[in-house]
Amino acid sequence: MLFETIRARVAAGILLAVFLTAGNVPAQAASTKNIVLVHGAWVDGSGWKPVYEILVRDGYHVSLVQEPLTSLQDDVAATKRILDLQPGPCILVAHSYGGTVITQAGTDPHVVGLVFIAAHAPDAGETEAANGKRFPSATSKTNAIEKTPDGYTYLDPAAFPKAFAADLPPEQAEFEAHAQVLTAAGVFTAAVTDPAWKVKPSWALVADADEIINPDLERFYAARAHSHVVEVKGASHSVYQSRPKEVAALIEEAAQHAQDR
């Protein structure tokens, strides 16, 4: 009888110790497996292919938004259509003007984190055009941005390789210069109303040789949003194509930690 009593007390003590120990171990947040990629002005989603391939290889479910680039409202709507197709929580990633799109669209409940890749991240009432005047880029100081009679913009193909894609192979940069998606001028003067980065954790990549968006503006956005930020030395505005490993690594970091913030 005495032996049985001692054994019962020992067993109870072990169970209590296990319970107390488990209570002191922080819960591990689930990794987010769904990634949505949003392109910027003058391009389409195909430029994300190198990043897409890395993310898919690493086990992520990746979707791409093809914005019409006709208005901020239309581009946000296109993004939300893809968000509605996600099977669970997702990380919303954008390049360039796409940052304005995800700033507006990222309040969607599917989104648990934002990643800005050489991208804009305006506050409520701000526009890309106004912020670009505060932080002029190398390209904005030239006449490289052209406009059609009906109000669609594009980069002078002769200026595109250096301004947009200086670290891509020359043949690729030349092709992209002639494959631009004309973008409504109004997207650059459309104001954000409800910035997602104020309520969602964010990560940001600064391309320090960017000639489309002033790198100091990218730094300003990241600091204001309290983003986890990395800088890629020598990277052009096309950093998402030229440095896909660094870009994918930042996206995966966001995916692994967004839900524990």
Where are the model-predicted features located?
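Bacterial N-terminal signal peptides
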Residues: 11-22
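Active-site catalytic motif of lipid deacylating hydrolases and related acyltransferases
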Residues: 30-87
